[in-house]
C-alpha cells in the first residue's frame, strides 16, 4: 500500500469515527475554535471553523496533500512545466500577474515575460486611447460603447469583473455578447450607434463558432448601416492566439492582441482577454486586479499547507466530496455586484475538474469534480436555502461577503451582512426539537407538538466565510486567484488535469454535422435525435423558426 492510499484510508476511518460529532458541540468545547481556524491576507479573512473537522482532520488532510506530492505539483505549475499533459502545455496564468522586476519565466526554454509585458501594455494603451477619445470611429466620433464578443472563459471572467467593479467604471459602457442565439446580440445592438461602438472578438483559436457567428452578424449590421468593409474594420479589435486568423477576418494587426497557448480560457482574464475590464475601469485599476491576484499567488506558493488559504479551501472540498459524500457545493456572494461570481465559479470548477480520467489517461480512482452552483445573497435565501437548512442533502456553502457597501449606505448594507452571518450560524447550529417547542410555548400542547417537528433544523451544515473589507479590484483579484488555486489543488489530489476540457469538444464536433443536416438531406443518428431534427424541420415549414 503506497503513502497516498494509506492517507486516503486513514481519512475514511476518521470519518467513521467522527461522523456523529456536531459542530455546535465542537464550538461549545473549543472556545478558541475561530482563532485556530481562520486565516487573514491583506483585506481578506477566511473562516473555516464552521466545518465538520478538527485539528486531527486537518492533519490527515495535510498528510493526503503530502502523499499526493502537492508541493511538487505546485512547483511545476509555478515554473512552467507542462502540467496540462493531454495538450502538452504549461499553465502559466500566474505569470500574467507578475509585477515588473520579476524573475524570468520559461516556456520551452524561452522567457515569456517580455511578451506578456508587451501585450499587456499594448492592450492597456488601446484601452486608454478609447477612454481619452484619441481613438475614434471612422466618422470621427468619440467611442461610447465597447462590445466584447466571446464565450466561456473568454466571456465569464471579464463579464464578472466588469460587473463586480461597476463603481469604478470610467467613461465607456461595456457590453457582452456570448450566446449564438440571435436574441443575445440583438438585445445589445438595438441600443448602440455603429459610429460610436468598438467590438472585440475574443477567441483563442479564432474558430469558436458562437463567437464568429456573432462577429459576422456585427459585420452585417455595419453593412446594413451603409459602412464599407474597410470602414467596418476600424470598429473591430481582437484577442486571439491565432493572430493570422484575426487578420484574415479583417482586423488590423495593431488591434489584435495575443492570447497564449499556455493559458487556458477560463484562466485568461489576466491577459488581453481582460481588455473589456481595462476599458471599463482603466489601466490603473486593472493593474490593481493583477496585484491582488499576485498577492494570493505569493501566499499560495510560499505558505505552509496548514495556513494556506487556497490549499485549505481545496482540502476541505475534498473532505466533503470524497469522504462525506456531499451532493454539491454552493457559493453565495452577499454583494449585488458579485452576482456573476457563481457562474464564473461554476465554469472554473466543473470544466476543470469534471474528469473521469486521471492525468495519465487511466480511469480516475475516486469521485472527482462536483456540482457547483450559487446565487446572490440575500435573494437565494428565498430560493434554495430551504434545501440547505432542512433538506436531506449535504451541500457545503461558501459565504462571500464584503464588509462595506458599494452603494449608498442607509442600513441595507448592514442588513445584508447580518443575513450572511445569520445564515452561516443557523446552518451550523440548527434548532433542536426542544428549542422549537420552547419557541411555541404559547400554543396549546397539541398544536405545539404538531408544529415543532417542522421548525426543527438538523444543523451541522458546514460553511466557509470569506470576508473582504471592500469589493475593490485588489480584493477581487485575491478572491479569484484563491479559487483558481483551490481548483488546481483539488486536481492535484484527484490526479486529474484541470487545464483541458475534452468533453466540451465532442458536442461541438457533432453540432458541425447536425447544423448542415437540419435543412434536410441524409443523416444517420439515433431515433431520438432524428425525431428532434424532424420537429425542427416541421416548425420551419410552418414559419415557426428563424435561421
Swiss-Prot record:
One of its GO terms (biological process) is glycolytic process. The keyword Isomerase applies. Keywords: Cytoplasm, Gluconeogenesis, Glycolysis, Isomerase. The keyword Cytoplasm applies. It catalyses: alpha-D-glucose 6-phosphate = beta-D-fructose 6-phosphate. GO terms for cellular component: cytosol. Its EC number is 5.3.1.9. It is found in: Cytoplasm. Pathway: Carbohydrate biosynthesis; gluconeogenesis; Carbohydrate degradation; glycolysis; D-glyceraldehyde 3-phosphate and glycerone phosphate from D-glucose: step 2/4. Belongs to the GPI family. Catalyzes the reversible isomerization of glucose-6-phosphate to fructose-6-phosphate. This is Glucose-6-phosphate isomerase 2. It comes from Neisseria meningitidis serogroup B (strain ATCC BAA-335 / MC58).
